[in-house]
Amino acid sequence: MAKAKFERNKPHCNIGTIGHVDHGKTSLTAAITKVLAETGGATFTAYDQIDKAPEEKARGITISTAHVEYETANRHYAHVDCPGHADYVKNMITGAAQMDGAILVVSAADGPMPQTREHILLARQVGVPALVVFLNKCDMVDDPELLELVEMEVRELLSKYDFPGDDIPIVKGSALAALENKDPKLGHDAILELMKAVDAYIPQPERPIDQPFLMPVEDVFSISGRGTVVTGRVERGIVKVGEEIEIVGLRDTQKTIVTGVEMFRKLLDQGQAGDNIGALLRGTKREEVERGQVLCKPGSVKPHTKFKAEAYILTKEEGGRHTPFFTNYRPQFYFRTTDVTGVVHLPEGTEMVMPGDNIAMEVHLIVPIAMEEKLRFAIREGGRTVGAGVVASIIE
């Protein structure tokens, strides 16, 4: 049979499986590819192919992640699955595999377990917009009342972490039944029902080009007779020649006009998400702009110094610290293109943070940075990465 070509004309969405160890995340991932392969929407990927996930580096941290792709009638999906709990923590915090939504896998035989709770909390902290639940191993539970009890527990746990627990779709089934062609109601049909719920409930992400313009400043040049040019890669949105923009971060916000956009030495009318451009700024002096600031649509991003973050601290083996740190720890925080010193305040009751921990903490930077929720950063000591984090919420 000829391999069906993936058509790229469907909207794209990034999702992943999360949940406690051995609750069936990888089996479910395999089962989805098996069931969707029947309609040519996937290539069946067996459990052991997914389980030996390759290692990859993200922000100086090694993470094992398996990627599969498949499509439903409505969407094309890129799906990530991680072999170990630590990989999930690192993946979600670094944003290595960005998730527009996630499938929370809970074993009906065990109910919610510690990592179930931790993954829901992480999803909340790092800003995963929506979750759908797959209650797995339902073929191991004979008592329908017990299933209802587990479902109630899961809904309560989701609500506790500010997800809409009462509204989140929960699909009951068995990934193993789907893989072994047993009990079609719990196997094959449940997988199709799950994908229908994912299609309907996980919102379509806004494409980067449709978001407000933002470009981190990488370099600044002055060109005699023309003015100041700043270079960088447009992170999102579009900037047109003649538009007003703001320069945000490190100092007071300034307004200016983009009088030219060039790429590969050619003049353009506009630059858009993904382009490496030089932007000519009207009336801006070379010393008024620096690396670490951003150019953005006026009013879209504000500079901040205090925020709450979720961070993962590297182990010694990963090249991180050898010793714990305490409150008032002062590393550098690398945002987009530059390091800024900040002071860490640990939560009440947390004495210290050991290498390998993930932790919610408060950070006070010594200078403001253009910042919004979900922004990723690295924690560094003298240029060496010792951790990774994400802005969970802004204080001021």
Curated annotation (Swiss-Prot):
The GO terms describing molecular function are: GTP binding; GTPase activity; guanosine tetraphosphate binding; translation elongation factor activity
- Which residues take part in binding GTP? 19-26, 81-85, 136-139
Entry-linked SUPFAM superfamilies: EF-Tu/eEF-1alpha/eIF2-gamma C-terminal domain, P-loop containing nucleoside triphosphate hydrolases, Translation proteins
Q: Where is this region: G3?
A: 81-84
The UniProt annotation puts the region (G5) at 174-176
Please list where the region (G1) is annotated. 19-26
Q: Which domain of life is it from?
A: Bacteria
Listed EC numbers:
3.6.5.3
Show where the tr-type G domain sits.
10-206
What InterPro entries does this protein's entry cite?
A: EF-Tu_GTP-bd, EF-Tu_GTPase, EFTu-like_2, EFTU_2, G_TR_CS, P-loop_NTPase, Small_GTP-bd, T_Tr_GTP-bd_dom
| Disulfide pairings | none
Instruction: Region G4: list its residue ranges.
Output: 136-139
Q: Which GO terms describe its cellular component?
A: cytosol
Localization per Swiss-Prot or TrEMBL: Cytoplasm
Keywords in alphabetical order:
Cytoplasm, Elongation factor, GTP-binding, Hydrolase, Magnesium, Metal-binding, Nucleotide-binding, Protein biosynthesis
Which catalysed reactions does the entry list for this protein?
A: GTP + H2O = GDP + phosphate + H(+)
- Record-listed Mg(2+) binding positions: T26
Q: Where is this region: G2?
A: 60-64
As for what it does, the entry says: GTP hydrolase that promotes the GTP-dependent binding of aminoacyl-tRNA to the A-site of ribosomes during protein biosynthesis.
The similarity annotation says: Belongs to the TRAFAC class translation factor GTPase superfamily. Classic translation factor GTPase family. EF-Tu/EF-1A subfamily.
How does the record describe its quaternary structure? Monomer.
**Protein name in UniProt:** Elongation factor Tu
Question: What lineage is this protein's organism placed in?
Answer: Bacteria, Pseudomonadati, Pseudomonadota, Alphaproteobacteria, Hyphomicrobiales
Q: Which gene encodes it?
A: tuf
